[in-house]
């Protein structure tokens, strides 16, 4: 084990000596050749150092575009996504009509995707990725990358849905029933293709019911009426749902509460 560590250390020192020797060489064309070799061998740190060193010399020359393109990828391949995004952006600004522009445009969006965190964390990068991938699809309607871009959008939207659903459930668990009802209804509006639409609607009904139960007497008629409206909307929107029976129970209980507080027959559920 100790011998292996020594070998690794000696190899690292030799590599450092090699790159330092190249960097000290006054010939930028030689440095570029070495950068290309390091790039081909996926030695991203060394390639990055050399590309950065020779860029001032090759600026304005035909080689510069490829240098900058690969320089951006050295950052990406080191998982320095923040820097890579900025480099891809600059490449597109300098070479908007390049044959590589479509690829780089995709990769710029992809850097935000790679920075997308777990669902419980801030989703700013997820939102940026969604927006940029959608722009990519619109800008490059015939791209072979559009299928992948669409799949990533779906993946990120599913993550956003999980985050929003957890937030709505937290409102409910904390007894903030009005906020929970609004949040569950917002899920239906923001994620119309969700597979959990009837579940969200049921949770909205439960939230409105609990909110009505805890209301002062002067507000109960209005708020139990709201529960009945939500129940009717559920039946209209999800006629085949397996949750209908539970919804009907909330509707019946709310009608009984209306009778109790108004002393008159409640409206029949449609």
Which positions does each model-derived feature cover?
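Acidic, polar-rich low-complexity tracts and alpha-helical solenoid repeat scaffolds
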Residues: 12-270
């Amino acid at each position: 084990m100790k011998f292996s560590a020594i070998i690794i250390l000696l190899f690292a020192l030799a590599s450092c000596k090699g790159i330092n020797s190249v960097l000290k060489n006054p010939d930028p064309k030689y440095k570029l050749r070495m950068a290309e070799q390091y790039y081909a061998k996926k030695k991203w740190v060394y390639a990055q150092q050399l590309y950065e060193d020779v860029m001032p010399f090759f600026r304005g020359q035909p080689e510069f575009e490829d240098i900058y393109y690969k320089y951006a990828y050295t950052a990406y391949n080191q998982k320095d996504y923040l820097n890579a995004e900025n480099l891809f952006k600059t490449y597109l600004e300098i070479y908007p009509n390049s044959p590589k522009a479509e690829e780089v445009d995709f990769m710029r969006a992809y850097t935000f995707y790679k920075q997308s965190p777990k669902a419980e964390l801030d989703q700013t990068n997820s939102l940026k990725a969604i927006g940029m991938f959608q722009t990519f699809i619109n800008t490059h309607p015939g791209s072979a990358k559009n299928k992948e871009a669409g799949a990533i959008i779906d993946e990120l939207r599913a993550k956003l849905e999980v985050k929003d659903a957890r937030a709505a459930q937290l409102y409910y668990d904390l007894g903030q029933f009005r906020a929970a009802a609004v949040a569950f209804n917002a899920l239906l509006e923001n994620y119309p293709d969700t597979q959990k639409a009837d579940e969200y609607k049921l949770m909205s009904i439960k939230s409105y019911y609990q909110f009505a139960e805890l209301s002062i007497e002067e507000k109960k008629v209005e708020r139990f009426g709201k529960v009945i409206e939500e129940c009717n909307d559920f039946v209209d929107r999800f006629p085949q749902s397996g949750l209908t029976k539970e919804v009907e129970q909330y509707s019946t209980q709310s009608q009984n509460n209306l009778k109790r507080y108004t002393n008159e027959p409640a409206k029949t559920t449609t």
